[in-house]
């Protein structure tokens, strides 16, 4: 591969602004993402760290097409995907997935797990109807859950189990790139390590690329290839994990490391 094709995702001068009103006739915006440039290499775990309100989740949602960018360019596997989700080809949607922070709000409480996992398979025409149950069973086993979970509902499960289902749903389409938006922050400490270890095993087994969003710097020390720090909508520092923890240079990064 050339250096250009090594990058599975490239973000160039991305801006996502939200209009919040007018003051003296002038439009006022929240600059949630304000000129971010970032490249993620195939097969790596890129850590994106920042406090609440730094813009990291907005960046993720813009990359996924859930928010339209105000300005800038997003390229995935060499294809410009800056337009919103509705204008993206199905094969791009299939290849890019996201796991949200709160599985309780991201899973339909009125559906059982079989229905939840079948939906992406149906949307993308991945398997025939008669093979659906077998495929759902395989997906459940991928995240270390038995087929007995198939007819449970999200409300009957614990937070860790629900997040495993969220991960299973994201992996159902066999993506190459997954955004993990604080996937363990809403879980008990006892289950966090299990989820992280499972994600790393899946990443290695399936050669996945992760954009791992978190506020937990210590977690990134152990799992990330590189780390980027987001502050007030901008990336203020980015380096290899070793370099980042050994020789941080930005005052905000130093503050995070000392807190």
Placement of each model-derived feature along the sequence:
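Conserved catalytic motifs of ABC-family nucleotide-binding domains
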Residues: 174
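The feature captures the beta-strand-to-loop junction immediately N-terminal to the Walker
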Residues: 49-50
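P-loop NTP-binding/switch modules centered on Walker-like glycine-rich loops
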Residues: 187, 191-259
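Conserved ABC ATPase "signature" region
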Residues: 131-148, 201, 257
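Helix-to-loop junction immediately C-terminal to a conserved catalytic motif
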Residues: 64
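Conserved ABC transporter NBD signature motif
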Residues: 72-80, 92
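Conserved ABC ATPase signature
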Residues: 153-157, 161
